[in-house]
Amino acid sequence: MPTDPDSRLRGNDEAILLAEGQKSAVTEYYLNNGEWPKDNTSAGVASASDIKGKYVKSVTVAKGVVTAQMKPDGVNNEIQDKRLSLWAKRENGSVKWFCGQPVTRNANDDAVTADGNNKIDTKHLPSTCRDTSSAGK
């Protein structure tokens, strides 16, 4: 099992890269439909279990929030089975993305709420992925 810091960062980097790969589809869906896609299918991306990697178990789209779930084993203890999210908010006619702890969104709200379950401790997140659920308010 990887225990060195580089392995931990690779896991986080992979999670962010796989999640970021869904951003354009989520953004396009929102711009075309005026609402956030409710799931992977409506966003036009692969199923959550098909978006995976060496360290990432799945990537889920839920109401426009993209959440990467780390694998329960084969990754550093600090991130085993933990999650991080990317989410967008409307801003001046466009869409601005944020990255950080896992969040959820109700229906077509712009606001997101922190989802404290299985979150990666902030100190283990890359500096570019430390937005809070209140970002952009």
Residues covered by each model-derived region:
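Periplasmic/extracellular, small/polar-rich flexible segments of pilin-like filament-forming proteins
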Residues: 31-137
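Conserved hydrophobic/amphipathic alpha-helical signal-anchor segments
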Residues: 6, 10-47
